């Protein structure tokens, strides 16, 4: 079987066993490394400036949104999984031999540079400082994308772009998903600078799948699992059979 695990499940196991920890008189738990990963995506077709998904302005728009989302990943994953999951910066599980390592030349934290290519974060930043730095970097990306920015606020969108976008997530309609807190916190942060990110919690998983498989979704949350010998080109090349995983 492939059971779902979270801090809530761990608490339930402890309650059933009557003791703290993974093992007890009723349930014995063994956690194993897993090649699966979850991700948050934006559709280039639906989130762009002026109908040109590949323009620099369109890329800057998507980077603005994702820079803020990425800043809240650690908090969201920690609250859901504790130390049983880690944040990844490339679309492959850290349990795979093919995953980039932090010691590799050129390794970067996802969405950690500003519009000028400078590092957003420093090693001594506290969480609140990190969130503030991400918002400041996002403003730079929004402005580069053609948004009107004044006094730390976004006041108008360029032609062919919007002040609000939506991300669909299958959190059972009640927020039960490891990425839900990440998104809601990012949405709250973006709201403070005048931009609306709507988090659409879809109770029916089939509706979520249909929203991105049909190409209708602006953004979505899903998951994938790499094979023993992963072919990332096949999976992510834009001219392949599908690149939404």
Where are these regions (language model features)?
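Periplasmic binding protein-like
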Residues: 1, 189-245
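Short secondary-structure boundary/capping segments
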Residues: 13-15, 82-84, 234-240
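Extracellular/periplasmic solute-recognition and catalytic clefts
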Residues: 1-46, 78-79
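Structural recognition of the beta-strand scaffold that forms the well-ordered cores
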Residues: 29-31, 38-43, 67, 76, ...
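A structural "hinge/loop" feature
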Residues: 41, 50-54
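Append "and occasionally in soluble cytosolic enzymes with long acidic Gly/Pro-rich linkers
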Residues: 56-188, 196
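Extracellular/periplasmic catalytic domains that process cell-envelope and extracellular macromolecules
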Residues: 21-22, 33-35, 158-161, 212-215
